[in-house]
């Protein structure tokens, strides 16, 4: 067997392996999400403002990525509860979820990793107003913080510690 044939066979194996590694790496890290934004502008679900009650609210602070805006929990006219983000902005990323965390605050990754949490689902957008429905069994006395959490990399993009409405007016 000559050297030319062995090199040719080697490249027939190496090139597909490189292509597969690039595709898997792109899928895992999703580098395009670092430079793209997903804007949302969801309307508030309440029809009758007089029947809407603020239960809790808090301001986002940055974690591993700049994060800003307000998180407010409302009880709306049908009795359901809604978590609403207003003036919200954070970085985009792969597999970013919204968590309700059983902690007073979540300033680092460990404070989310070592606490109980409820996953409200994938983030709807990294910029803009958005709503998340809260289950009727979610104990707001226990779950005191909203976290923007990247499941893929275990990173807390930012968090909003919540205060009861009675404390907000003081």
Which positions does each model-derived feature cover?
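An anionic, turn-rich surface loop/hairpin at beta-sheet edges
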Residues: 108-136
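Short, surface-exposed binding/anchoring microloops in extracellular/periplasmic proteins
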Residues: 68-95
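C-terminal end-helix/capping segment
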Residues: 158-170
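Hydrophobic membrane-insertion alpha-helices, especially the h-region
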Residues: 12-27
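Transition segment at domain starts
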Residues: 29-78, 112-118
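Beta-strand signatures of extracellular beta-sandwich domains
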Residues: 97-99
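Short, exposed beta-strand-loop hairpins at the edges of beta-sheets
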Residues: 135-159
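N-terminal Lys/Arg-rich, disordered targeting/topogenic segments
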Residues: 1-9
């Amino acid at each position: 067997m000559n050297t030319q044939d062995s090199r040719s066979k080697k490249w027939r194996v190496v090139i597909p392996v490189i292509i597969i590694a690039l595709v898997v790496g792109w899928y895992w890290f999703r580098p395009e999400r670092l430079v793209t934004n997903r804007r949302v502008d969801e309307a508030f679900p309440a029809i009758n403002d007089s029947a809407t009650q603020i239960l809790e609210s808090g301001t986002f602070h940055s974690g591993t990525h700049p994060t800003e805006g307000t998180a407010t929990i409302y009880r709306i006219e049908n009795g359901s509860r809604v978590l609403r983000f207003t003036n919200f902005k954070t970085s985009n990323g792969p597999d970013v979820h919204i968590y309700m965390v059983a902690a007073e605050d979540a300033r680092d990754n460990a404070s989310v990793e070592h606490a109980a949490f409820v996953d409200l689902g994938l983030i709807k957008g990294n910029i803009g107003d958005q709503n998340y429905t809260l289950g009727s069994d979610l104990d707001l006395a226990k779950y005191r913080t909203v976290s923007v959490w990247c499941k893929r990399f275990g990173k807390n993009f930012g968090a909003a510690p919540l205060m009861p409405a009675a404390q907000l007016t003081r």
